[in-house]
Amino acid sequence: MRYFLTVSFCFVICSTAFSQDKSYKIGFLLDKTNSKIASLVDKLEEEITAVVGEDATVVFPDNNRYTNNFDPLLAKNQYETLVNEVDIIIAYGVVTNEVLAKRDTYPKPTILFGTVNEDFIEDGKHINHEVDNFTSIVTPLSYREDLEFLKNLVGCKQVGILIERGAIAYDPISEMITSLAAELELDLSLVPFDNTSDIINALDDQKAVYFIGGLYLTDSEMKTVADALIQRKIPSFTTSPISDVENGLLATNNDQTQIDQFFRRIALSVESIVVDDVFHESSSLLTVNKSLTINFNTAQKIGIPLKYSLIATTNFVGDASDIVADKEYDLVSVMTEVIAENLTLKEAKQNVYIAEKDAELAKSNYLPDVSAAASANYNDPEFAEATNGQNPEVLTAGNITLSQTIFSESANANIGIQTALQKAQMEDYNREELNVIFESATAYFNTLILKANYKIQSKNLNLTKRNLEIASQNFEAGQSGKSDVLRFRSELVQNMQDNIESFNQLKQGYYVLNQLLNNPIDLIIDVNDAQLDSGIFEEYDYHEFNGLLNDPVERKPFTDFLIEEALNNSPELKFLDYNLIATERSEKLFGPGRFLPTVALQGQYNHVFSRSGAGSTFPVFIPTPPDGYYNVGVSLSMPIFNQNKQNINKQIATIQKEQIQFSTDNVKLQIEKNINDAVLEIINQVTNIELSIVFEETAKEVLELTQTSYENGAVNIIQLLDAQNNYLQAQLASSNATYNYLIAMLTLERYIGNFFLLESTDERNAFLARFLEFKANIED
């Protein structure tokens, strides 16, 4: 037995040593490189290492990455060098492809990968034929299809085709450009470049651009080019991967899965070399799923309208809710602007002005009433002669009359009533102002919620597209039935509808804000995100506020203090108080006040301007009166019995007084209830913030595990759909938690009658000082 164990142990040791002795050096031959290409090569190395696993040791010497800079002679020499330095050669690029494809023999296993235009695919030497130590893995690319996509997307008539200068001689586009232009009815021109400056300098002559090249531009260089295109509002399309669209180009017909499929296919080819030691593999076309990818933000910036029909077949990058706005708002700017511009408030302000004028009108009863009059009379001559000068044939005269109230209880009462009603109207305006501010703040947060909802629905749509791909792959591999594919297609349709609705709801949210802010409804606005510990909320210490509410010992006195503050600040109570003052004054008027007399002063000055004709002179026995004379008098009046109206009016005033008192008590109870409700809602939202984070993290992890299990056939579609929907709900809950908390805080502030964001630091400190004083008084 000991002998058997010894032999077995030796066998294991030898086998392990033999496995570890298998080592392969892998080198790369490229047309050009930069940080982006180097990163992709690093990723390919990781994929190869993972696939080969323990079958052998693969080594990637840094000095065996060669670039020829589009020089075919250099590419040929570099290949010969790699033959002597490494065991496996991986090559990429149009020049490299041209050089290696012309060879008859390959001393070392050589893997060539890249793209080939569909119009030039033929059954040639390296397609579907075995060549010792050589395979080419190419994916078809259609310039015609890309240009047609670009034309349909933006409606262009002229397109500049951007390509590296060194690659022109080796790319079929030079041969195809004439036929493509005729077939697609486009004005096409080649725009060669060596660097970003060449591209930018050529943009002024372009209406749209198509990148055949550009893979060798770094991310920062591509962003520079994309910014220049956006500035000139030039749409762009590219053959390069999705990362360039993420950097600002408009669209591509590729997505990230193409690179992943390439790398996996190359890694499998390397594995076959390692395992078999002999490399016999047919060159082949790698068919990948094409998917139109559009940068939503770029489309919006250059003014390209996107059709809803694109949602089903298109992947969107960027943030559709991140728009180029004519105006941007944070919460404070919304609150301050709505005070100044809201039409409801402007209308309510007019009522205040009217009440002010009513008060002025009441006070004007004590101002003198002065009037002037003039007359011209013609009398019958015979009648005039008979009146002895009292009514001459022709008479012109005038008078000035003065009337001045000295004392009037009804006038005094009216002044008091109108003054109280003016103040009541002002409190009604304050109530309306608080309501409109709260409405605008709620609309602001609702817009943020709708924005977050749209982002999440977009992510969920992309997730469903990915799950549909997995279901299709499982169906093709025989791991699941077609029903899974059909189910995800149905889910995709529903998600598309949800996505469209969420986007339109976001636009409606902007419409609501525009209406409240008195902006044109179609004005493009955006709202800045709101976070508790940053921006305008940084100095707005909600954590201390939460601490008072979260502590059961502190909560009761703090809630009582908030109720007291609300009662002191409430414009509803002040409105009722002023109405009560007006009603009491009315009650007094129709009570004892009715026995007070009204005293007034009257005076008049008369003047005869002319007397002529018959009867214009007085007889000698009648003294001639002066042409001008005056009279002054004082009047006193007091109602004795006015059809019992005084008693009835007093009774009405008494009833109204009791009614106002009932309303006041009801409002006080309502305020107390509202404060307590708001405090509980804040506590709910505080816990919701913490729990929603855990909910989202857990749901995400469950989805990832379920997705992997479904991909491997370990779970069914129902479990995957449940996990996806659960994650969707978790995301919605998590993203909205902070906004709902802030809405709850603003609701409490509305009930208190004071918005802290509109206060100064001193005013907020004074609020805290009042609470400490209130608490101290309770403890005493």
Task: List the model feature ranges, each with a label.
Residues 1-23:
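Bacterial Sec-dependent N-terminal signal peptides
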Residues 347-365, 413-459, 466-473, 490-499, ...:
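Extended amphipathic coiled-coil alpha-helical segments
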Residues 435-565, 681, 685, 726-727:
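Periplasmic alpha-helical coiled-coil/stalk elements that build and connect Gram-negative outer-membrane
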Residues 317-367, 521, 533-581, 586, ...:
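Bacterial Sec-pathway N-terminal export signals of envelope proteins
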Residues 303, 475-479, 710-714, 751:
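A short glycine-centered flexible hinge/capping loop motif at secondary-structure junctions
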Residues 270, 338-406, 519, 563-642, ...:
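A small-residue-enriched
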Residues 511-529, 733-780:
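Acidic, low-complexity, intrinsically disordered peripheral segments
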